[in-house]
Regions:
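Bacterial Sec-dependent N-terminal signal peptides
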Residues: 17-66, 70-86, 207-215, 242
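N-terminal helix-cap/turn-to-beta initiation motif at the start of protein domains
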Residues: 80-99, 127-129
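Calcium-binding acidic motifs and repeat modules
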Residues: 35-49, 66, 105, 138, ...
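Beta-sheet ligand-binding and adhesion/scaffold domains
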Residues: 76-84, 158-254
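Generic short beta-strand segments
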Residues: 99-107, 135-141, 165-169, 196-200
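Sec-dependent bacterial lipoprotein signal peptides
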Residues: 1-22
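N-terminal glycine/threonine-rich, aromatic-flanked beta-hairpin/loop signature
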Residues: 109-161
Length: 254
């Protein structure tokens, strides 16, 4: 009888030990890192072009504390790939000819903030050697000044901003660099391009609202870019009237 009791006790202890080990192994086995879900949550939180590396790492550690180093590397690689795809898509959307009104804000010689309205055509041509940059031409017109034509270089940077560098004029003036930050972009689709460009080396801000006039096919493609995702980083509460802009431009404006 004593031997039977001892044997039963040993069996119970073995079963308890097996249960505890099994529970621990089950927890590890049941953990699954859902990469697609993590990407969706991340871009919903930080927008189409994410945020800085430190904030990204902190966000990942907070929401996925049990993820492995491999999971984190997979996540970062997927984020970078998604951002590069967005850059490429934006550049392909820009590729072609856009037309519409542009309002240029600047200060006159009396120090007053004023604006001039133009009708513009922006022609973007994607480089054959790059997916995110190229050359272009701006045609700008109003009745008082007539028409001007200026060539430029452009690119979509890693933050979704569109950088435009106008070629130096024949008079020797330095090139003018304008920047359309992603949070100043109302909309970019295959048919509509609206936002605000801000001078980098000149104090000027331009509000524009353009529609696609002619699509431009990329070399090697047989069809134009199909309609798809719409880009835009500006929220309604970010939009402010430009009346208080402190703008000083040599000779009035570019």
């Amino acid at each position: 009888m004593k031997k039977l009791a001892t044997l039963m006790t040993a069996v119970v202890l073995v079963m308890m030990s097996a249960t505890m080990v099994s529970c621990g192994e089950s927890d590890d086995y049941d953990y699954y890192f859902d990469l697609d879900r993590a990407l969706t949550e991340y871009f919903n939180r930080y927008g189409d072009f994410g945020t800085d590396d430190r904030t990204t790492a902190d966000w990942f550690d907070h929401y996925y504390p049990y993820a492995s180093d491999y999971d984190y590397r997979s996540f970062i690689n997927a984020v970078n790939a998604d951002i590069n795809n967005s850059r490429t898509t934006m550049a392909r959307y820009l590729n072609g000819e856009w037309e519409g009104p542009l309002r240029m804000y600047f200060k006159n010689q009396a120090g007053q903030t004023v604006y001039t309205d133009y009708q513009v055509i922006w022609h973007f041509e994607l480089s054959a050697s790059s997916d995110v940059k190229g050359r272009g031409t701006e045609y700008r017109y109003n009745e008082d000044e007539g028409e001007t034509r200026t060539n430029f270089s452009w690119c979509v940077n890693g933050y979704g901003g569109i950088e435009i560098s106008y070629d130096p004029s024949q008079s020797g003036q330095d090139p003018v660099n304008m920047h359309i930050a992603y949070n100043n972009l109302d909309k970019l689709s295959t048919t509509h391009f609206k936002g605000t460009s801000v001078g980098v080396n000149i104090e000027e801000e331009d509000d524009f609202n353009l529609t696609k006039r002619l699509p431009q096919r990329v070399k090697g493609e047989t069809t134009a870019v199909a309609a798809g995702k719409t880009f835009g980083g500006k929220k309604a509460d970010d939009k402010t009237a430009p009346v208080e802009r402190n703008i000083t431009i040599k000779n009035g404006h570019r």
